[in-house]
Amino acid sequence: MAEEMEPLLEPTEVFMDLWSMLPYSMQQLPLPEDHSNWQELSPLEPSDPPPPPPPPPLPLAAAAPPPLNPPTPPRAAPSPVVPSTEDYGGDFDFRVGFVEAGTAKSVTCTYSPVLNKVYCRLAKPCPVQVRVGVAPPPGSSLRAVAVYKKSEHVAEVVRRCPHHERCGGGTDGLAPAQHLIRVEGNPQARYHDDETTKRHSVVVPYEPPEVGSDCTTVLYNFMCNSSCMGGMNRRPILTILTLEGPGGQLLGRRCFEVRVCACPGRDRKIEEENFRKRGGAGGVAKRAMSPPTEAPEPPKKRVLNPDNEIFYLQVRGRRRYEMLKEINEALQLAEGGSAPRPSKGRRVKVEGPQPSCGKKLLQKGSD
C-alpha cells in the first residue's frame, strides 16, 4: 500500500474526546473512590466481575389442599329398639363388681351373687366397681341405661313416677327430672335422650384405676322406688352398663337386675330364701312334674261268716223290745258268749252283786 496507515489513537485520547462531547450535567456524575488511578489500569486487564445478583426469594410453601374426602371417626351403631342384655367382655375383658354387704336392715345397698341383683334404697349411692384386663383407648366412656326385664315391657322407656319427677331430688342440677339413673360426685357426667328409642342414659368418662387399685368406682343413684305407681309399678328392671370407645363403638357390656326398695337387706334375704326353696332355678320357677299316681283301689269288703255278722232290727214298742232283748241274751248265753253292752241313753236294770265301794244300789225286797 502506497498510503501509509494513520497511527492508531491511544485509548486515553479516545476516551477524553468522547468525554468532552458529553453535556456538562453528565460530567458532574459522582465518580468511584478509585477514580484517581483508573488510568493506570491496563486496557486489556479485565476488572473484577460484578457480584452475582442475589437469588430470588423462594416462594412461600403453599398449604397442602385439604383432601376431597377427609376420614371421619368411627361412629356408634344406631341404638336398637330392644337392647341386648347378654354379658360381653370384649377384647378389653370388661367386668363389674360390687362392694360386699350383708342382709342387715341398716344397709343401703347390697348385691346378691346368687340372683345377680342389686338391692338399694331410693337416692342412695350404689358403688359399682369397673375392671378391665386391657386399658381401653383414650377417650373411652361408661354408659348406664335401664330397661324393663320382661319381654312385654321391654319396649317401654324406664322413667320416674310423676310424684318423684315433681319432687326433683338432685343437688347438681345437671340431670333431667325424668331420668331414673344418676351419677353422684362426678361433674363430667352427661345425660342423654336417645333420638330413636327415647331411652335415658348417663355417660361418664372412663378413668383408669389409681395406683395400688385394680378397679374404678362409679356411684350410681336410682331416683324412684320399684313399687311406685306411674313409674316402674313393681316391674323388674335391668341396668345395662357398657364400655364405649371414643367414637361410641361398643367395647364391652355387663347387665344386672336392680330393685329399689325401703329395706334392701330384708328383701334380698327373702328372695334368696324363695330361690332356694324353688330348687335354685333361675328366673321364674317352674313346678316339677310329679310322676302320675295310680288311682287308689277301692277297699275290699271283708267276707264275714253269716253266723258272726251283726244285724240291726227296728222294734216298735217298749214291751216288744224287752221281750226280743231277753230272747237275744238267752241265745248268747246258750252259745257261751257274753251279753251285749247296753247302749248309752237307755236305762237298763242292772242285776248282779252290789259294788264293794261307793253308793250301793237299793234293791226292792220280795215280800
From Swiss-Prot:
Motif (Bipartite nuclear localization signal): 286-302
DNA-binding region(s), chain positions: 87-278
GO process annotations (BP): apoptotic process; DNA damage response; positive regulation of apoptotic process; positive regulation of transcription by RNA polymerase II; protein tetramerization; regulation of transcription by RNA polymerase II
InterPro entries in the record: p53-like_TF_DNA-bd_sf, p53/RUNT-type_TF_DNA-bd_sf, p53_DNA-bd, p53_tetramer_sf, p53_tetrameristn, p53_tumour_suppressor
Binding of Zn(2+), residues: 161, 164, 224, 228
Biased composition (Pro residues): 46-81
Region named Transcription activation (acidic): 1-30
Region feature (Basic (repression of DNA-binding)): 347-364
Broad class of the protein's primary localization: cytoplasm
Cellular localization per UniProt: Cytoplasm; Nucleus
Needed co-factor(s): Zn(2+)
Region listing for Oligomerization, in residue ranges: 308-339
Pfam families: P53, P53_tetramer
Domain observations: The N-terminal and C-terminal disordered regions undergo liquid-liquid phase separation (LLPS) following homotetramerization and activation. Post-translational modifications, such as phosphorylation or lactylation affect the ability to undergo LLPS.
Family: Belongs to the p53 family.
Protein name: Cellular tumor antigen p53
